[in-house]
Amino acid sequence: RPNGYKLLCSWLVAKKLNLASSFTFFKSEYRNNKQSEYIASAWDNRYIFNLSGTYNFPRHWSFGMKVSCIGGAPYTPYDEEKSRLVTAWNAQGRPYYDYSKYNTGRLPAFGQLDIRVDKTFYLKRCMLGFYIDLQNVTKSTFKQPDIYMSTGVIENPSDPLPEQRYKMKYIEQKSGTLMPTLGITFEY
């Protein structure tokens, strides 16, 4: 049962300032049958916000900025107890999900700020432009579910095989890189 709302706004001020924004609020759930409870779908981030603007300066210079925010996506946590069992891990070589908690976890929201500066030259029959674009200026981190991994060390080697458990560790999954780009545009 997906549903949502979207608001769009756009402003143009005296050919110098151009602003556009959008806010989307939504909820996306489903259920396996009429008796089961609703479950968040994989793309149920709940909201998306974008604000972008460009200001045109004299002599064909322009400055642009974009702010983007998105709510955290749902995820399914691991079944840590089952994943630790030596026989279970060796059978699959990766962790098991706890499907009784399907999509009950939620990642943190993510926001990003991008900026761009352009300089344009108008020649007789063409246009030449140069720009520098900086994505994720604030170095905001985008988080994914951590990876649950076996260290290969058995914590209780003297126990019977069905009771033996691996020592486990989590590997953090996040990124937050500042991405600079230099560019040239040419039109004729």
Language-model region placement:
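Extracellular loop and loop/strand-boundary signature of outer-membrane beta-barrel proteins
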Residues: 6, 34-40, 100-104, 167-172
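Gram-negative outer-membrane beta-barrel transporters
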Residues: 1-74
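Membrane-embedded beta-strands of outer-membrane beta-barrel proteins
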Residues: 5-7, 51, 115-117, 182-184
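C-terminal beta-signal and adjacent terminal beta-strands/loops
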Residues: 19, 69-92, 108-112, 119-188
